[in-house]
Amino acid sequence: MIVVVDDRDMVTEGYSSWFGREGITTTGFTPTDFDEWVESVPEQDIMAIEAFLIGECADQHRLPARIRERCKAPVIAVNDRPSLEHTLELFQSGVDDVVRKPVHVREILARINAIRRRAGASATSGADGTQLGPIRVFSDGRDPQINGIDFPLPRRERRILEYLIANRGRRLNKVQIFSAIYGIFDSEVEENVVESHISKLRKKLRGQLGFDPIDSKRFLGYCINIE
């Protein structure tokens, strides 16, 4: 899930629609609401955030420090002004990257992945996706590949696979996966749907790989395990 902070509801709603077409869930806040949320959000919820996108708002320079107090996810600022000085000020405030409008959400996703690669937060990564054993994921709306061949998946299963690979080495519980895929405020979907998605994903991976790469432990959660 990506958190978008902007003074304008029209902008946060627009990002929700655009990212949604790529299978990415977003949650939008005004700066005031974001301050209250980031102060009180439970640890397991904020750990499900994949990135923060800071749009035009009066507190644009202050927000990166607030985010860093709670989370290490990539922070990207959207610069509406064609000003070098403003761009430099945004970098000095602690953002990981600055993009200028107009920008496609796929470029934003690619920049998020590049930040993760530089931070060493993912598995073996290159300019074109993240490789874990025979599996390559892209996190930009494209289907994953297994041994270089496209491996089409429904959107939710694809996002779960991407999230597990992005968090290789960590065991993720059902709540964390649900929050990352559906958003932390989605009350219309039951968390148990995660078990159904993962069951289907495991069956497909087992059929393609000849083994099940997703390890599960009751009460502890799931992790992807490929040597």
Curated annotation (Swiss-Prot):
UniProt cross-references to Pfam families, sorted A to Z: Trans_reg_C
Knockout-associated phenotype: Inactivation of the ftcR gene down-regulates the activity of the fliF promoter region and the production of both flgE and fliC proteins during vegetative growth or during macrophage infection. This mutant also lacks the flagellar structures under growth conditions in which the wild-type strain is flagellated. The mutant is not attenuated in cellular infection models but exhibits a marked virulence defect after 4 weeks or more of infection in mice.
GO cellular component: cytosol; protein-DNA complex
Keywords of the record: DNA-binding, Transcription, Transcription regulation
Spans traversing the lipid bilayer: none
Domain Response regulatory: 1-116
GO biological-process terms attached to the record: regulation of DNA-templated transcription
Domain of life: Bacteria
Alphabetized CDD domains for the sequence: trans_reg_C
GO molecular function term, any single one: phosphorelay response regulator activity
DNA-binding region: 127-226
InterPro entries referenced in this protein's UniProt entry, alphabetically: CheY-like_superfamily (IPR011006), OmpR/PhoB-type_DNA-bd (IPR001867), Sig_transdc_resp-reg_C-effctor (IPR016032), Sig_transdc_resp-reg_receiver (IPR001789), WalR-like (IPR039420), WH-like_DNA-bd_sf (IPR036388)
Keyword Transcription: yes
PANTHER family: REGULATOR OF RPOS, TRANSCRIPTIONAL REGULATORY PROTEIN TCTD
Other comment: There is no cognate histidine kinase partner identified so far for FtcR.
Job description of the protein: Required for transcription of the fliF gene during vegetative and intracellular growth and for production of the two flagellar components flgE and fliC during vegetative growth. Specifically binds to the fliF promoter region. Could mediate the action of VjbR on flagellar gene expression.
Name under which the protein is recorded: Flagellar transcriptional regulator FtcR
Lineage: Bacteria, Pseudomonadati, Pseudomonadota, Alphaproteobacteria, Hyphomicrobiales
